[in-house]
Regions:
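C-terminal and late-domain segments of enzyme folds
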Residues: 156-220
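A short beta-strand-loop structural module common to alpha/beta enzyme folds
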Residues: 41-60
């Protein structure tokens, strides 16, 4: 799944849409983390960042230079239809397409299938595919919202998200952004995606997430 030639050409993104399908606490957290990091890097570098556009609320003529689709691997036909309706509005616009996939299952087969469907949908609409991040953490990752971004629990996902931030800031694919930034382009997978896993063994990870989730609920 290689990035298209246009996806490897840097482009200044003035506007960008962030879409989560379905609307879930986990996907909203991942998009929040991405947007927060984009804003932080812009402040540090003294540059501007793409203005968010709400395609669900704005009129049909709202134009965007890029889109980030956040989905989970329980990606069914209903979710695909919703994605296609959004992508139809961007058809032939040269908008950069990025994705975040939350892998809920233990293996990545379902996530790979979701990626393939999204990639083909972008290809059919002549939208440059610019890769993204697969978060292999199971469910309830939103429980990490108040954990330090570069602490033990969030660090692997933050580092993966930072690569996506770099790509969006350059307006190109993650792989090409790594090359332009002097990083290791080979750190991603063969399909250009960056896959992030917890730094802790699965049993410990799930126990911590369950504990954090319970504590968050008790504080509501």
């Amino acid at each position: 799944m290689e990035a298209t030639a246009r996806g490897d050409v840097p482009k200044t993104l003035q506007t960008i849409a962030y879409i989560s399908i379905p609307n879930s606490a986990d996907l909203e957290f991942l998009l929040w983390d991405l947007q927060d990091a984009i804003a932080a890097y812009a402040r540090l570098s003294g540059t501007t960042h793409p203005s968010p556009v709400d395609l669900k609320a704005d009129d049909a003529d709202a134009a965007v230079d890029g889109i980030v689709l956040a989905v989970d691997d329980a990606f069914d036909d209903e979710a695909m239809t919703a994605v296609e309706q959004i992508l139809d509005r961007l058809k032939n616009t040269d908008a950069r397409a990025y994705v975040i996939v939350q892998a809920l299952s233990k293996n990545t087969k379902q996530a790979d299938e979701a990626l393939d469907r999204l990639y083909r949908a972008c290809l059919l609409r002549d939208l440059p595919w610019c890769d993204g991040v697969v978060v292999c953490a199971g469910s309830d990752i939103a429980a990490l919202r108040h954990s330090p971004r570069m602490g033990l629990l969030r660090r692997p996902f933050s580092e993966a998200m930072d690569k996506l931030v770099g790509a969006i800031r350059m307006g190109c694919s993650i792989e090409h952004a790594q090359l332009l930034g002097g990083g290791n382009a080979g750190s991603g997978e063969a399909d250009g995606m960056v896959r992030a896993k917890p730094a802790l063994p699965a049993p410990i990870w799930h126990a911590i997430i369950k504990h954090l989730g319970s504590r968050s609920q008790s504080n509501i």
